[in-house]
Amino acid sequence: MAYELIAFDMDGTLLDSHKEVLRSSVDAISEAVAAGKHVAIASGRCPRMVSMYRESIPGVRYAICCAGAIVFDLAASRVLSEVDIAPEVVARAIHTADEEGDYVLEVTTGLGIAMERRGIEMAPQCGVGVYKQLYLDTSDIVEDAHVVALDPTARIPKLNFHFVDAAARDRTFERLADADVTITRCEVSSIEFTCPGVDKGTGLASLASKLGLDISQTIAVGDADNDLAMLRAAGLGVAMGNAIPAAVEAADVQVADNDHGGCAEAVRRYLLA
């Protein structure tokens, strides 16, 4: 099979343990682009956060953002497709989370996210302290994120709840299992919500279609729960060496970890083979 598109998850995959892109990854991506291949990022992050890395990896033109809810052209700074969560589902999710424990609300709106300053300061307590500076640099700081989320006219492709307590996260997850929404566990004690049937796998399929490719011509590289659908949907699923067991099981092959050239290995061994 000749693969034409490779999509990399960011955290734990394209980014190393220091949240930086390895030189080996940059070089391999440049080789892929020079060979006429397409390279994309597939992330739970919003377009604004993903765009911050474009200078580090200039060969990457497309991004599957918000866990598949937005397909974005980085070069043109343009949304190619967006799928939003129904307002009544947003309201139910927030009211349920409110009953289960203390959490930080991250609301994706447009190309960025809305967060409260108090919430950003709480990031370390919720297992997402590594993103605190990123939140400060890229978020729209609002007085009350709940007001933003509960506005019935708002377009919200993704919601994130970062709980102080993982048990509260799990209770919320179970209570919303029947909701008309896709729910995924992420980080230490977080959950993210997208429209039903939307995940990185559907985002990958959408991008492939826009590029005139079949999904069988794609490679997906990831390490975590929110990569499972993408790993299964792609023509070739590649798990990182640091991937969780479920990701290894969902993938077809495994490469080195995110600190030791796994992404470069995926490009050279499978995309450019």
Predicted regions and their residues:
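Short, acidic loop-to-helix structural element flanking the phosphoryl-transfer center
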Residues: 19-37, 82-89, 141-145, 197-209, ...
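Active-site phosphate-binding/coordination module
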Residues: 20-128
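Conserved acidic, metal-coordinating active-site core of Asp-based
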Residues: 96, 100-104, 108-221, 225
